[in-house]
């Protein structure tokens, strides 16, 4: 409802602008809900490709149970948070804990139950089973937690991205995914996690002038998603569905508030 609230001295006050109607507020709510569903669907398709590449690349190099090898991951790292508390980031321990929980679960996937009932060793299932039951957040942590840069390069190269940018983008996508999953407002949000900038691409279609785009707004995320889907799901209808949704609610939403740059529709990637 904030877009329809008045401002005084630059501050939003608890009073609606003139001529604001309930239908206007409701239409904005419906638009945001449809946008979340569209984005969540696209992320699911991307998630399959990321999961597949992690399994494929690391299994070829380290074998079927690479997830059980602590030597391929960075050492545990202690970090001081904004509130002064200290936490330890340990990717290997985190994924091992999750796999163990899945093995013990009474609601485990059928293929996990099969492995548990038939095999005693290795204790954990092979990576194509273990990674299948991981959350998107685990995939993001694996990418950032690999010790050898060459390991993440193999995954990032599939998506035509430098490793550092790929890890940043996947981290941002996980953040957006959580917003969608928890029904949070999406359309005009100022993102608390800002992805790194991709300046250009020689292989895939990208923004002609990234410097003009606000990376803390949802439009940049749309561009990221479309870029990744060019490889992950070339037949994806994401951009067509997005443009249709924007056109349907063109009298409801402000494109500048979403970070859309002037002339965005003329960009090659949105043709």
Predicted regions and their residues:
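Long, contiguous internal "core" modules enriched in hydrophobic/ aromatic residues
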Residues: 1-271
């Amino acid at each position: 409802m904030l877009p329809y609230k008045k401002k005084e001295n630059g501050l939003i006050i608890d009073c609606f602008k003139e001529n604001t109607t309930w239908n206007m507020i409701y239409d904005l709510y419906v638009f945001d809900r449809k946008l979340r569903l569209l984005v969540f669907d696209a992320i699911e398709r991307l998630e399959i490709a990321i999961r597949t590449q992690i399994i494929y690349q690391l299994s070829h190099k380290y074998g079927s149970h690479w997830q059980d090898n602590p030597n391929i991951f960075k050492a545990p790292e202690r970090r001081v948070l904004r509130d002064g508390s200290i936490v330890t980031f340990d990717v290997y321990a985190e994924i091992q804990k999750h796999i163990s929980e899945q093995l013990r679960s009474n609601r485990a996937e059928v293929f996990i139950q099969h492995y548990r009932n038939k095999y005693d060793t290795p204790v954990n299932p092979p990576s194509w089973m273990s990674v299948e039951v991981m959350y998107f957040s685990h995939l993001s942590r694996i990418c950032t937690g690999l010790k050898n840069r060459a390991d993440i390069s193999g995954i990032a190269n599939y998506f035509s991205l430098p490793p550092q940018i790929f890890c940043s983008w996947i981290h941002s996508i996980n953040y957006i995914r959580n917003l969608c999953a928890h029904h949070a407002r999406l359309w005009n949000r100022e993102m608390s996690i800002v992805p790194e900038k991709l300046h250009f691409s020689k292989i895939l279609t990208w923004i002609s002038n990234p410097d003009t785009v606000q990376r803390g707004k949802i439009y940049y995320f749309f561009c990221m998603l479309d870029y990744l889907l060019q490889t992950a799901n070339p037949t994806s209808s994401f951009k067509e569905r997005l443009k249709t949704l924007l056109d349907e609610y063109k009298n409801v939403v402000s494109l500048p508030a979403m970070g859309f740059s002037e002339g965005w529709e003329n960009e090659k990637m949105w043709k």
